[in-house]
Every structure is written in C-alpha cells, then in structure tokens.
C-alpha cells in the first residue's frame, strides 16, 4: 500500500537509488496455546461487502492495482481474507501480479492495493522502486490461530507465541511525507511465507487526514459485492 499523508510536491523517480530494508525478527513457534481468537463469530459489514472497486486499474509498469475502502489499511479481517483465507480470489479475478510495482499511482489523494505473487520476491525488490528512498521500516506482527472454520484470525492474547503471524512493514516516503507504504504477508515461525504479498499505498492531501484515518473509524464507503466470484464466495468467509 502507498499512502500520501499530507500535502506537498509530487514524488519523482530516483533513477535506481534505494534504501535497504531491514530484516524482521519473528517469534518462534509454540504449540498448545489457548484457542483465544478475535472474530470467531463473524458478522457485520466485513462479511457482506467487498472493499475493492472493480475493475482493477493498470499502472504504467503494467501491474494491476485495486482502489479500495480506506478501512482496509487497519482491518485485519479483510487483510487475512484476501492474503490467506481466500487468496485464490485475487488470482481468479486477474489481479495477482508477478512483479513488485515500480511506483504508486501519482494522485493527490488515494488508497490503492497491489497483490503480488511473493514466490520470487526478495527484500531488495521490495525496497527498490522509482520514488524512494523510504524511511526506516516499522515492523509489527499480530499472532494468528485457526478458528472453527479453519480460517486464520488475529488472537486476542498478544503475550503468547503462535505458529503464524500477520506481518506488517510500514514506511514513509522521505521526499513526500504524505505518502505511506505498507507491506503485509503471513509469517510462519521464523520464516516469511510470502506466497501472497499485499502492498498498500495511502496518500492524503493533508497530514491531519492521516490522523483521522488511524484514530477514528469514519463512515465507510463500501460497495456491494458485484463481481460474480465475490458473490459466489462472500458467504464462506
């Protein structure tokens, strides 16, 4: 994800310069933990609506991106649904990229999402684009366990070591601080399982709009699930 967090000049290509990405340290596996989960009982808007605006857009480098509801930035239900629990949906609608995008769309205000097949993706590729350098990476991980539907959910207890984690890496464009980028993928123990990688970019016109996005959950502008694949599968997760 990329996110412009305040008003300012438009970013420019850096002609191949990039800032290395730090490697993350993730907790070791530990079996036998209490099955203590958020969203074991699902309901509400998340299960009935699609956060994406279809059809997908095409960036200058040929990669596909999706415009989406701003709540996706912090919504672990949607993130896990399309990254892990029903990741095949993205490939079925033709939005799974085989390369990391070179740059986000250059808009004054947007939030957009790239799904990338992470089999051949390295940290160097993630850190290299045509708009960097980026700030130091802020790394977080949320423990995951399977629910009764065999779907991964975020655990309530943050002090326990789980087998899987939802890994997040967040950074800000140094030359244009209103643009943020977030990587998300599933971690397994000490390993990075980047079979499907999510890159979200978020841009706002002014800095206070970013604060509103992070603190206040404003009224969402969701679309009904109109794509036939989402209609067929929306009730399963």
Curated annotation (Swiss-Prot):
Pfam families: DUF7747. InterPro entries: DUF7747 (IPR056649). It comes from Caenorhabditis elegans. It comes from the Eukaryota. This is Uncharacterized protein ZK892.6.
């Amino acid at each position: 994800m990329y996110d412009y967090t305040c008003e300012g000049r438009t970013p420019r290509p850096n002609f191949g310069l990039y800032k290395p990405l730090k490697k993350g340290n993730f907790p070791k596996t530990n079996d036998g933990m209490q099955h203590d989960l958020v969203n074991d009982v699902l309901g509400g808007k998340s299960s009935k609506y699609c956060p994406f605006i279809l059809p997908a857009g095409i960036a200058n480098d040929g990669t596909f991106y999706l415009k989406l509801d701003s709540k996706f930035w912090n919504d672990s239900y949607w993130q896990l649904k399309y990254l892990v629990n029903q990741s095949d949906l993205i490939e079925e609608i033709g939005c799974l990229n085989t390369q990391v995008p070179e740059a986000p769309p250059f808009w004054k205000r947007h939030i957009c999402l790239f799904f990338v097949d992470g089999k051949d993706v390295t940290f160097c590729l993630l850190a290299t684009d045509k708009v960097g350098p980026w700030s130091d990476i802020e790394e977080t991980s949320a423990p995951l366990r399977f629910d009764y539907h065999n779907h991964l959910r975020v655990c309530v207890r943050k002090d326990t070591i789980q087998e899987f984690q939802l890994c997040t890496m967040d950074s800000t464009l140094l030359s244009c601080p209103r643009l943020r980028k977030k990587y998300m993928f599933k971690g397994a123990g000490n390993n990075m399982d980047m079979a499907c990688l999510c890159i979200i970019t978020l841009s706002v016109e002014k800095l206070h709009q970013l604060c509103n996005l992070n603190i206040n959950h404003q009224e969402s502008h969701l679309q009904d699930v109109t794509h036939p694949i989402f209609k067929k599968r929306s009730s399963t997760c």
